[in-house]
Amino acid sequence: MSEPRKILVTSALPYANGSIHLGHMLEYIQTDMWVRFQKMRGNQAVYVCADDAHGSAIMLRAEREGITSEQLIDAVRAEHMGDFADFLVDFDNYHSTHSEENRELSSAIYLKLRDAGHIDTRPVTQYFDPEKQMFLADRFIKGTCPKCGTADQYGDNCEACGATYAPTELKDPKSAISGATPVLKESLHYFFKLPDFEAMLKQWTRSGALQESVANKLAEWLDSGLQQWDISRDAPYFGFEIPDAPGKYFYVWLDAPIGYMASFKNLCARRPELDFDAFWGKDSSAELYHFIGKDIVNFHALFWPAMLEGAGYRKPTALNVHGYLTVNGQKMSKSRGTFVKARTYLDHLDPEYLRYYYASKLGRGVEDLDLNLEDFVQKVNSDLVGKVVNIASRCAGFIHKGNAGVLVGADPAPELLAAFREAAPGIAEAYEARDFNRAMREIMALADRANAWIAEQAPWALAKQEGQQDKVQAVCGLGINLFRQLVIFLKPVLPKLAAAAEAFLNVAPLTWADHRTLLANHQLNPFQPLMTRIEPAKVEAMIEASKEDLAAAASQPAGNGELVKEPIAAEIDFDAFAAVDLRIALIEKCEFVEGADKLLRLSLDIGDAKRNVFSGIKSAYPDPSALEGRLTLYVANLAPRKMKFGVSEGMVLAAGPGGEEIYLLSPDSGAKPGQRVK
């Protein structure tokens, strides 16, 4: 028998400045299912995580709420832990990056990098808010685009024309925190010499540690040459002070991944069988996996392994990268009620419904996953209630009525039982490869076979016939054993259902190896309903409650620590407005722009003509194809603008503060391409 594997697993650290939503839960459920499978197989799998608790955003929110940053992150951590626990995510440890373990490790790693010559310093000139007495990151500066003249744009890019620029190029800059006019000020910054590790990273990213598509994307960065990474921020800042630099703090992305190590170290202090160096030492034979979203690949696949290498630690065995969550084929939307917080979901629906649905759609690739709410209801009701639970509910009553609840050990269908046993290695292989959707398909195919066989045997009809009681017990006994097999296969996904089934079956917690055995002459406990069907009305209630969450947030005082209230622009007369030719446009094609961080290329049909537009909305629409076929509003008479990537022939209209919160405007149903907006 082979030795159990030593496996350390992490999920990305959620930021301690907001609630967990269903997009976040995709990753934690995916990771939890994989870890539970490993533990069922007898491996020493350890799952750690923590709140990412540093940065200006946290400091500013705490200030706005009149509490300390520590009080804020403690409250948010408690909220996060409650959400994860109720979604049955079973961390071995859930810590915080604002911990002594993380302070010690961050300082030690920095000093090792410094002593090895991997740290550089140089002066940096940037905007400074004279009222708040703090340097301003790009997102904390707003002003007029130096390229197209659009007001109220961020400090690094224009969402109107897609131009990128330095914050110092912005016209009429204002602090988005205080509204004050910022001044330029010089400060000494600390840099990690990432180019020192270019050769190592080129090898490591092609070593099998990454999905091929991720490795290909990183190759673009590596081939264009790596730049030094700014790892310092000036006071005031909520974080850890750099050991040899008073008033300078580690940038949040330096100490955040070290939080994985810190959480594990915190666990080691409570579990003597765990040795920190056995998992993190340079020559560790343990496996280390990071489950992350595709938006933070660069930090985990470039900066993080370079830091570990430079400080004398091991590198990850692999990064398991997943895509984004969409709902009903579109980006999660607060106004449509599809931006659903974890707690709002839990207030209305069973967490195992979502765990199963995610499992049924999650593959090992980086593709986005769509939560189609109609399909969600149908799939859960059909698969879990109509197939799996149905087997037990069909058979249990006959065993209790006809044999006092004792399950006999007969095997009236050896070929069917053999099919279940023969399927186990393939299902295990799918779990191991994170091909959860394949595992669910194979499990449900077995459930279909079991239900078809039971229907063919018709124990309900046999029970009415003289002399058929032994056959009824044999059929139903095998039915319960097949149900037990399915529960074993589904336990990583449905731990609560599995626990209820174990209570009914009157057995100890099931392991993966238990699929090789059968219950025989075994006393069952009375059967209780294991799962109920999803009522569509409850899904609708969840959507409405999510809209109420938005309304409640909108009723709060304006401002989130990053933005000041946006004033109404200067008054114009009707002729000035009428000069803008707004048209309905059909998005025929939408695609990424090679080499552009923020742009999408939209091919538009405006009725009697085609137009090509570049729009800075990539951060909000990570899957461009989701926009294809949509109608939007288009400025048709804006002068064409020559850009680095081609000519942009007009502009599409969107609302929102930027980043992920950009909302492309759409007309009401019935509008046609080319119609003028009046």
From Swiss-Prot:
Keywords: Aminoacyl-tRNA synthetase, ATP-binding, Cytoplasm, Ligase, Metal-binding, Nucleotide-binding, Protein biosynthesis, RNA-binding, tRNA-binding, Zinc. Binds 1 zinc ion per subunit. Its main location: cytoplasm. GO terms for cellular component: cytosol. Zn(2+) binds at residues 145, 148, 158, 161. It is an enzyme of class 6 (ligase). A motif ('HIGH' region) lies at residues 14-24. It is found in: Cytoplasm. A motif ('KMSKS' region) lies at residues 331-335. ATP binds at residue 334. The keyword Acyltransferase does not apply. One of its GO terms (biological process) is methionyl-tRNA aminoacylation. Residues 576-678 form the tRNA-binding domain. InterPro entries: aa-tRNA-synth_I_CS, Anticodon_Met, Met-tRNA-synth_bsu_C, Met-tRNA_ligase_1, Met-tRNA_synth, Methionyl/Leucyl_tRNA_Synth, MetRS_core, MetRS_Zn. The keyword Zinc applies. Pfam families: Anticodon_3, tRNA-synt_1g, tRNA_bind. It comes from the Bacteria. One of its GO terms (molecular function) is tRNA binding. NCBIfam families: metG, metG_C_term, PRK00133.1. Is required not only for elongation of protein synthesis but also for the initiation of all mRNA translation through initiator tRNA(fMet) aminoacylation. HAMAP family: Met_tRNA_synth_type1. Homodimer. Belongs to the class-I aminoacyl-tRNA synthetase family. MetG type 1 subfamily. This is Methionine--tRNA ligase. It comes from Pseudomonas aeruginosa (strain UCBPP-PA14). The gene is metG.
